[in-house]
Amino acid sequence: MHTLDEIRTAIRQLPVDQRWKVEACLRELDGSPIPDSQVREARPAYAGLDPAIMTFEEFFGFEQKSPLRHEFVNGAIFAMSGPTLIHNLIMQNLMFAIHAHLRRRRPCEVFSSGVRLVIRRETNTIAYCPDLIVDCRADTRDTYYLRDPKLIAEVLSPSTELIDRREKLLNYRMLDSLEEYVLISQDERRVVVNPRAERWKPRVYAGLDTAVELRSIDLTIPLIELYADVTSP
């Protein structure tokens, strides 16, 4: 019988596209975060530039001066693409629904993509810019970063879908505070909720006659409201 390390060594000899799928299955088994090399193979089409290597402290200083938003993954930085009009409409609808729901549920707050989320685990340091975060831990909030989200939502796009579904899911679930990870489609009326309580098994809500359940914050949103004013595609 081969050890896990021996299997990993053999997998590294596979073509990139095959290796991605097999390593994703292995990470599901041992719960490890996504490897740096794997991230950099998936990111170029999304970032549009070669990753630069720097410390997290250097990244923090760089980000304060940059007019663009970036994400930081274990020393590599990646520029973020701008959102579409449909993306903005969906996020406005989601923000409005959650903000109204949480107004009397302090200390929970909802934050948009301008706020970064820091993940630290052993030797890994990651800073993401989720589209939406619900945070109920006022005691761990920083001026610029959040650390203990209760819910994270991302609106999918062709350039980010692979990253949101694979890399970010694997890294987000390392956060003990996270209860739900929500993926919202722009191309169809479809929302996928990945709940910790169900071992991250996705719940799928599709069609304007359905409503998405965000059980972590006790909120149900009809998809017809989430996609209000979205006239295409």
Functional labels for PLM-detected ranges:
Residues 2-10, 17-233:
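Gly/Pro/Ser/Thr-rich low-complexity, intrinsically disordered segments predominantly at protein N-termini
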